[in-house]
């Protein structure tokens, strides 16, 4: 894959950044500027039901923005081709930092504040550490997924299990490699 279009504008694809439950995210470039281009996929996910994924992404983006969660800007959405163009947040993920034995302690206060903002807005975000990038000392939630708040999926009850080298984190890495 060399290029993808978003609303008839062509973007060069540099590399695959990652695959999530809802799509593939690519590092893309146009006119010397880098972006994230997300292509929605329709592969089955045993533990999650999406409905219309592109509409859900747009809806969730607005909910996160209104709540005050630090997220990359959605620059364009192409409903027909199920593609989203996002601001590229350049930096390491919390996941990669943990995997490489870099302390994430400096970011714990920020994630706890973000979790409190989400809770006050009645939302849970996906606290898995691949969804957070550090840029200039700030953490960004780079996914747009959010759900109605449920205590069992809060940062304190679920997310924290993956923000250090806990048995859950180590088990995830061993299954992934």
What is each of the regions a protein language model found here?
Residues 35, 70, 84, 140-143:
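Protein kinase-like catalytic core scaffold
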Residues 119-124, 135-177:
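C-lobe/activation-segment region of protein kinase-like
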Residues 49-67:
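The N-lobe alphaC helix and its flanking beta3-alphaC-beta4 segment of protein kinase-like domains
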Residues 50, 69-108:
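Conserved structural core of kinase catalytic domains
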Residues 127-132:
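Hydrophobic residue at the +6 position relative to the catalytic HRD Asp in the kinase catalytic loop
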Residues 10-55:
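ATP-binding glycine-rich loop module of kinase domains
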Residues 104-120:
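Amphipathic alpha-helical segments that line or abut small-molecule/effector binding pockets
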